[in-house]
Amino acid sequence: MGKEKRQKLIFKEAVEATTDVKEGYCEGIKAFGEYKSKIKVPEPSKIDGSLDIDVTTAKLYPDDSRWDYALCYDSEVFYIEVHSAITSEVSKMIKKPQWLKSWLEKKAPKINKLTTKTKQPYYWVQSSKCDIPRHMPQYKIAVQNKILPMREWDYSKILKKEK
């Protein structure tokens, strides 16, 4: 079995071994549904799969600030939240990674093991335009929490920022 095929199996197996989301694995970026256009990668064959965490955990945690998606690309898992990018949503976006980190640690350790260690793992992708003016305190809060919104999740741009 080739390395590429094995890596895809590892992410799929991690999802299937996680009781909360065991039926949620999707090939490619299918989990993103209407937001597929927000995901850009240089080599689509390196997409190991995706997971809609929000939908698959909604009944289990209806009142929690659930995270939207997990994407495994090139054997690393990234977490992407497609959400309104307005000042009133910044506080919600601060809570969401906290929920995700706790959920990964307690309920999804196999997925957590695949989380990228070499890059920022959490990304806020704006669902439409961004309206968080730089002079507003919410902008500073988003910067401090390393969760500024972006138009799209573009792996090539992320690589450039990390270098």
Predicted regions, residues:
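Conserved catalytic cores of phosphodiester-cleaving nucleases, focusing on short active-site segments
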Residues: 69-71, 75-86
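Mg2+/Mn2+-dependent nuclease catalytic core
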Residues: 86-103
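Arginine/glycine-rich "motif VI" loop of SF2 helicases in the C-terminal RecA-like domain
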Residues: 102-116
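Short, flexible loop/turn motifs enriched in small residues
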Residues: 62-66
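Acidic-basic catalytic patches of nuclease active cores, encompassing PD-(D/E)XK
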Residues: 1-61
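Short acidic, S/G/P-rich loop/turn micro-motifs used as interaction or catalytic elements
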Residues: 60-61, 85-89, 129-133
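Domain-level recognition of nuclease-like catalytic cores that cleave nucleotide substrates
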Residues: 4-12, 112-163
